[in-house]
């Protein structure tokens, strides 16, 4: 959902599909407990169909908008989600440096000189991103 700072995940299945045939779910969880506020917010978010559908729609629209901005500057969409997008660009380090000068944080990868990952900007930061690109 892109709720900043909230870490909450789910594993949904039957006893058969979740039965450990290798590592158990507990092995994947690590030592981090789920915070009470995350449970409360997650419960509310999953119970509010109007909010959930509106959020899905907004995230999809924002991802398409970001794709349009980056591809107009020569980037090519490689993949991603509605929260993060992965692009192939000519020089990812140069793009990252240019974006950082405008306080826009991105991620590059040590195994690819051309991959750049961007998250969706806050609604009032689109102009800043457009200017940086």
Q: Could you describe each region identified by the protein language model?
A:
Residues 1-70, 75-77:
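PLP-dependent aminotransferase class I/II
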Residues 6-7, 81-83, 112-116:
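Short amphipathic alpha-helical segments
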Residues 13-17, 89-92, 123:
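Short loop segments at secondary-structure junctions
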Residues 15-18, 87, 116, 132:
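Alpha-helix termini
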Residues 51, 68, 96, 125-126:
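Alpha-helix boundary/capping detector
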Residues 59-60, 64-102, 120:
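Conserved PLP-binding catalytic core of the aspartate aminotransferase-like
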Residues 97, 101, 111-133:
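PLP-dependent enzyme catalytic core of the Aspartate aminotransferase-like
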């Amino acid at each position: 959902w892109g709720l900043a700072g909230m870490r909450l995940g789910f594993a949904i299945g039957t006893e058969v599909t979740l039965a450990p045939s290798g590592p158990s779910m507990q092995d994947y969880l690590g030592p981090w407990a789920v915070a009470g506020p995350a449970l409360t917010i997650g419960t509310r978010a999953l119970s509010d169909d109007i909010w959930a559908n509106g959020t899905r729609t907004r995230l999809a629209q924002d991802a398409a908008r970001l794709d349009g901005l980056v591809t107009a500057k020569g980037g090519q969409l490689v993949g991603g989600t509605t929260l993060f997008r992965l692009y192939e660009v000519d020089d990812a380090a140069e793009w990252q440096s240019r974006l950082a000068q405008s306080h826009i944080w991105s991620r590059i990868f040590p195994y690819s000189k051309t991959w750049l990952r961007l998250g969706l900007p806050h609604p009032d930061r689109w102009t800043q991103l457009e200017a940086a690109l």
